[in-house]
Amino acid sequence: MNIFQKIPYHLWYLYKTEFLRKEVIRCCRKEAENADERKAAELKEVETYLQKYCFTLFPYRFIKKYDKIRIEVERDEEGSPFVYRGSKKLFFPEKWSDERCRNYYREILTEQDKESPHCYISDDKRLPGEGDSIADVGGAEGFFALDHIERAGKVYIFECEEEWQEPLRKTFSPWKDKVEIINKYVGDKDDEGRNFVTLDSFFRDKKCDYVKADIEGAETALLKGGESTFRNKVRKTLLCAYHNQDDEEKINRYLEEYGFTHEPSHGFMLMAAGYLNGDKDSFKPPYLRRGVIFGSR
């Protein structure tokens, strides 16, 4: 593609993001009219950011501190890249360049900032308990499980992406006695042919105190297939709610039915990638999505 072919797309992208910036500001003001005090303040934060800065996934100033953060990538004797997360090694796929590792880990640091709408542990009440059995569903690189590995009694990491299998094995090799990596999807039905399992079938004879899930919008299917587990075993849960516009409402409904109280993470995310790539139905008013729902009982 030559420079003349690039210009129209670039201008189109700028036009779309500017349109969305103004549209979200308008929606923030409209939503705030009937919002409670907390939500009104959160909406004002988004509006204030977008009045000064460009449209972005996390419309908050905290993201600026990660622009130039220094991230050291090292490699083990087999050439596998890793970063230190505290004193623990977090591994990435061997074929990844150091720069790709740095960019990926920067995204983790950004989304898990205490001010981020995607932050899992924004306060101590969200922490797993000592000796808890944790299900990390959609574990990816495993940072969540790694952060809580020492307090956990057992950790089950559900991750199907092949490129993460070896990095996960290396990351958790010091704790292999209490970590199980399960190469299955979690959904609302058991289906061996499609490699799906429900929480209810997997944990039928196992302890499960804590469930964290980030599974591309399938969190409601996980809840449907985990009714007995949630009703009788789980005490705390973190469920991502940003993939689909109505996920927050659906997740809250399941949690209430299962006897949980719930609260959202602070702030909102602006999930516009699909819209900017041509899927107009993927990003609609009121545009703002909660990142994570915390449930407890």
Tell what function each PLM region has.
Residues 1-297:
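Phosphate/nucleotide-binding beta-alpha loop and adjacent structural elements of enzyme active sites
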